[in-house]
């Protein structure tokens, strides 16, 4: 900053010299304030090359380089001199098997070998064909007398002999053929009154009501509507028919199916004899079954639902019926 003030003073003084003939030197002025920083100068020239630095520490080993290309085969070296025999070295490791060599030529035929031992007996061969017929041999000597031959055929009938004496009386002959039917005889006397024949009877027909429809499963169905049960062979309290007359019976059942599927079985003494099933679709369906059975005294028959409450669609109301019937065809007494 001082340099700028100095230059300014010199410029003023020079102006005054031009305007006046003489100039007196004044007192030094007050130093001015420092000026602003000048612009950066240009880069200097490169200096001289410095001394060689110390050797750096060894770097980390580099990764192995790629294998170089194989060199050309060298020329055969000169034969070595034969030296004294060295000490026998240790046995080397076994080398890998070499490749199979080419097949050798066939050698000359060897001499005949010695006879071998007799081998075991072979299996029996198949039967050979029949050979040709040989020439007829000479006639042999006469053999011993043979046994007596069988009787010869019957000879012709001889002449009739003289009449013999009368024999004894023979047995009575078989009855003769039945004769022609005779004339109708007179009316006989009236007989006595016979005993009245009483035929055994057993029959029933029962049905369901509004109260007993949709019965429980796996138990006898208790039909509470009595259509015919004169001899009380069907027990409405337990839902079973009991045989009082041994014989052959006919059983049948008619079912109105509504709202649910139906699956029932006709049971004899706990054994299911006849099965009927109907899948309900819409409106009302009908299902039935019938059978003829031989029963003994005391046998029990009943109808029951099987398969659970999904199959108890047996229906009854004022216009629809579900019935169970059984009756005796003939007795075996």
Swiss-Prot record:
Q: In which tissues is it expressed?
A: Expressed at low levels. Not expressed in adipose tissues.
Question: Which residue stretches does the UniProt record annotate as biased composition, category Basic and acidic residues?
Answer: 42-55, 69-88
Residues spanning the signal sequence: 1-19
Subcellular localization, as worded in the UniProt entry: Secreted
In which residue ranges is the amino acid composition biased (Low complexity)?
Answer: 26-40
Annotated region described as Disordered, given as residue ranges: 24-189
Ranges where the C1q domain occurs? 197-333
What keywords are annotated for this sequence in UniProt? Collagen, Repeat, Secreted, Signal
Q: What is its main location?
A: secreted
What positions does the domain Collagen-like occupy?
A: 24-82, 95-154, 155-191
**What highest taxon heads this organism's lineage?**
Eukaryota
Disulfide bridges in this chain: none
Pfam short name (any one): Collagen
An example Gene Ontology CC term for this record: extracellular region
The UniProt subunit note reads as follows:
Interacts with CTRP9A and ADIPOQ. Forms heterotrimers and heterooligomeric complexes with CTRP9A.
What does the protein in this record do? Probable adipokine. Activates AMPK, AKT, and p44/42 MAPK signaling pathways.
- What protein am I looking at? Complement C1q and tumor necrosis factor-related protein 9B
